[in-house]
Every structure is written in structure tokens, then in C-alpha cells.
From Swiss-Prot:
Family under the similarity heading: Belongs to the universal ribosomal protein uS11 family.
Function per UniProt: Located on the platform of the 30S subunit, it bridges several disparate RNA helices of the 16S rRNA. Forms part of the Shine-Dalgarno cleft in the 70S ribosome.
SUPFAM superfamilies given in the database record: Translational machinery components
Protein name: Small ribosomal subunit protein uS11
GO cellular component, one term: ribosome
Any GO MF annotation of the entry: structural constituent of ribosome
Length: 128
């Protein structure tokens, strides 16, 4: 029986400066780290980290997702990011703090939340 060839893990290097996109909705948070052209290096979400239902939109879930995403990108060589934050949900600040704590320097934070100029009617308020 022939020996199986063991494939080396491919090490991909990226440039040191990139972008971090944090999409925070009322139900989930999605974090993507990309290079300067916008090609995604690593991504994570609260659902990917194992949180379910209402636990996905907590600051702790955002922290865990950001930690997972930032570790992979840091190992690939990403060191500085411009953060683009979109959405009204919880965990926006905790995700930014976690990315900074993982060794990736945050150069600037830009809020790109889409605001309607009196477009669609919003959903009715909940009565709990």
C-alpha cells in the first residue's frame, strides 16, 4: 500500500493594511476582515460561533465572533484596519474593542448605516 502524501498547509500572506466590516442587525452580527481591495480574508458571525436565537445579538456574541475573525487575519499578516460599521444592533462597540485587543490597530471608524430619506414604513413597535 502506497503512503499518502501529506499536504502542507498553504500559508497565505496579505498586506498589513485592510478593512473591517461589522454588520450588526437586530438578530445577528457579521464581521468580515478584508484587504485594501475588499477581498475577504476572514469572516465570522455570532451564529457561526454557536449562539442561537436572541443570544446572537448580545455584545458577548459579537466579542467572540470578532475574536475568531481577528485571530485568523492577524496570523495572515493583517495589522491595521479601517472599520466600517453598519446597522443598529448590539455589539458594535465590543466588536471594535475586541479587534483592537487582538493586535490589529484600528485607524478609523466609519458609520455606513443606511438611513432612509422617508422611504419604507418601519415595522410596528413591539408591545411586550
Amino acid at each position: 500500500m502506497a503512503k499518502k502524501a501529506v499536504a502542507k498547509k498553504k500559508v497565505v500572506r496579505v498586506e498589513a493594511v485592510g478593512q473591517a466590516h461589522i454588520h450588526s442587525s437586530f438578530n445577528n452580527i457579521i464581521i468580515s476582515l478584508a484587504n485594501s481591495e475588499g477581498q475577504v480574508i476572514s469572516w465570522s458571525s455570532a451564529g457561526k460561533m454557536g449562539f442561537r436565537s436572541s443570544k446572537k445579538n448580545t455584545p458577548y456574541a459579537a466579542q467572540m465572533a470578532a475574536q475568531d475573525c481577528a485571530k485568523v487575519a492577524y496570523d495572515m499578516g493583517l495589522r491595521k484596519v479601517t472599520v466600517y460599521v453598519k446597522g443598529p444592533g448590539n455589539g458594535r462597540e465590543s466588536a471594535i474593542r475586541t479587534i483592537h485587543g487582538a493586535g490589529i490597530e484600528v485607524m478609523e471608524i466609519i458609520d455606513v448605516t443606511p438611513m432612509p430619506h422617508n422611504g419604507c414604513r418601519p415595522p410596528k413597535k413591539r408591545r411586550v
